[in-house]
Amino acid sequence: MSSLENKNIIVTGASGGIGNAIIKKLSEAGANILASGTRIEKLEELKKNFEGIKILKFDISQSDKIEEFIENATGELGGSLDGIINNAGITQDNLAIRMSLDEWQKVININLTSTFLMSKFAIKKMLKNKSGKIVNITSVVGHTGNLGQANYTASKAGIVAMSKSLATEYAKKNININCISPGFIKTAMTDKIDDKFKEVIISKIPSAR
């Protein structure tokens, strides 16, 4: 039996490419899944493809509504929460000297601040269970930096550091917090990246793809 069998798990950013793949694996493992994202048509598609999955449209930029979202999502899962995968995020690329304050703050707020708040309110639920797991999806560029992505790389590096702090705070409460830092993956989000930036990213990959 899978260790994820009947575990209640929230997945944000589920309407995107990586989120879709995460849902597939969790479903195969027998987890109870609440899929969240901004594109309802994609969420409805997930509901058709994966039996028993629950969906809830939510935009993580609404930071003042994240606590309510966690409450509602946990309720949809039967009242308890075993895990959350914080996968939602955005890019808004520009060279540093051209990057507006709004471009900087928007990416930091959505990627970093919202991930913190999702984790914070999920931990409150997990403390009641006396266990839980959080997986934060970051990026390899959060470790290496990248041309035209000062805001995005800072947000992802921040998630790594934040996750280490949260892991230290709650390890003795049987709550594990980890990060996964994927490389460049073709998704709807990365398709929006300027072709010149894509070339720079791909040139740093040994297999050049």
Predicted feature residues:
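Alpha-helical segment proximal to the catalytic Tyr-Lys
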Residues: 124, 168-172
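Conserved glycine-rich cofactor-binding loop
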Residues: 15-16
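Substrate-binding pocket helix/loop in short-chain dehydrogenase/reductase
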Residues: 95-96, 103-108, 190, 197, ...
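Residue(s) in the substrate-gating loop at a strand-loop-helix junction
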Residues: 139
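The beta1-alpha1 cofactor-binding region of Rossmann-like NAD(H)/NADP(H)-dependent oxidoreductases
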Residues: 58-69, 101
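Active-site helix of classical SDR
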Residues: 119, 155, 163
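Active-site loop immediately N-terminal to the catalytic Tyr-X3-Lys motif
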Residues: 97, 144-150, 172-173, 208
